[in-house]
Structures are given as C-alpha cells and as structure tokens.
C-alpha cells in the first residue's frame, strides 16, 4: 500500500498566507479610522470599544446590510475600490436616521478563492467609508470557501453599531402636519434596484460604456453611495429634526411611511427637483412606469428630513455649507382614513 500524498489546507483551496497578506495590506486603512474609544488592535478574538463619555444615557443602535447585486456589476467591470464605501453607507445612513453617531463597523467578505489584490481594494473602500462617517473599522471576517462561489465572485455584508443620547432619539413621534420635508441629493442609484438595472442593461442591449452626460453609463451606475452622517449630525445639533427617511429598497412608497405617525402623510412635489440623467435613462430604456421608478429607486433623493417649516431656510443653508445639495421637496399633511401615506404630485 502506497503512502498517500500529504495534504494541506492550501491543497483544499484555503490559503492562510493570502489571508495574512490581506491583513497586512489593510492595516493602514484600519488605523485611519481609529476612534479614541477603541481598545486594542486589529486581530483579536473580539473587538473592544468604550462608549463616548459625552453621553449621559447612551443607547446603542445597530444595523446590518449588504450591497446587493450592484456587486455583480462591480465584479464584471472590475470596479472593486468603491463597493466598500457602498457597504458602509448602507449601514451608517440607516443609523443616522435615528440620530445615532456611528461608533464602529465590522465587515464580512466571502469568496471561493481569495484574491489579495481585489480584497485589499474592497477593504480599503470600507476604510474610506468608515473615515467619511467617523466610524472605526474595528474588525471583520474574511471567509475563503472553495466550492461556495464561482470564479472571482465574492459577497459582502456589513455590521455597524452607533450611539445616541436616549432623550435625543429620532423616531418620528414628533412629526406633525405642517412640517416641511427637505430632500438631500443622492449620488446615483446608491445600492438599490440593481437587479432591475441589470435587467434593463440586458433587455436594451445597451453599451455600458456609452456616454451619458459626459461620462460612461457604467460610471453613473457604479457611483458609490453618498454618506450623509457628518452633515446630518450637524443638522441634528443645530435644528429640530422630527424624522429622517433613508430612501433605499422600496423607494419613496415604502421608506417614508416607516417614520411617519399613522395620522400623517407626506405630500411631495414631484417637480421640485430634477431627476439625474441615469434615472431617466433607466426609465426610458426599461420602459419602467413612474410608480415603479419611485418604488425601486431613489430617483435622485437619498435622504428626506422632516422638520418645522420655520427651520427650512437655516437647514438648507447649513446643508449647503456642508457640501450637500438639498431642497424643499414637500410637507406633512393630515391623513384621512386609509389614505396612502405618500403622495407625489
């Protein structure tokens, strides 16, 4: 009987050395995001973080999300450096809705065969997103799983924890008829509706490299999700914000009602802003109904803020000073019976 060839983990498709190389590559990106509350260094079994001392009754707010099938486009067009920003944005923008300051972030990166260069690019993007939102990249998991993913495919998930003063939680309970609605511009489709985006590309047989308003269509589609955290934290501090809605999956129809009392509805002026060109392109080339556009995409509005009408001018000035494009988009009105909670006129 012959002696069998000795096997290693690498023979089975898992390269520990590649994982170690990745950790070495991302140290600078992680260090850049460090907050004073973080204890210890990258690589521990668990990540430690103190609560900021400025909070008297701190409440932790948690969230998790992914990038959806936008990853398919990013992988196909080898654009790996910004999907990490998307990942962070989808999580921290959800936290800021409740007034929470993001504290720390963890990521999960799964692939069939670890490509160190690709993974480094992705995690550096995560670090950039954390830096933009003032959030510490405190840890993560890189899972190399042969047989689970095809070719160069990978998947991402993000997990974020933030903190808000108990008395300052924003939950929509203060929303009342007469409140104004301010919209903050999106950078594009963000990270939602990409299964429909890909279907439009397929059905229309469009060239993703074709010019649209001076840059390739694919560049519009892969533009990273805008992170609103720092500008909205300043707005919360300076104004009386009653509610915020992050316009993600489900669009206007599903996200705005999540923060409204049952007796209120949002009345939005559809002509108060101009859709970015990419949404008009999708609507035309996919023959998508307007209702479906508002149900699937943000249509140029990444965040909506409800606040007293007499605070609008100051809020718009503050947001402009923070580099945000924002405008008055509508108002809160009384809701009668079983009326829809969102009207777009």
UniProtKB/Swiss-Prot annotation:
Pfam families linked to this entry: AIRS, AIRS_C
Superkingdom field: Bacteria
GO term, biological process aspect, one: adenine biosynthetic process
Localization in the cell: Cytoplasm
Pathway: Purine metabolism; IMP biosynthesis via de novo pathway; 5-amino-1-(5-phospho-D-ribosyl)imidazole from N(2)-formyl-N(1)-(5-phospho-D-ribosyl)glycinamide: step 2/2
GO MF term (any one): ATP binding
Protein keywords: ATP-binding, Cytoplasm, Ligase, Nucleotide-binding, Purine biosynthesis
InterPro entries: PurM-like_C_dom, PurM-like_C_sf, PurM-like_N, PurM-like_N_sf, PurM_cligase
GO cellular component: cytosol
EC number(s) stated in the UniProt entry for this protein: 6.3.3.1
Similarity section: Belongs to the AIR synthase family.
Record protein name field: Phosphoribosylformylglycinamidine cyclo-ligase
Gene: purM
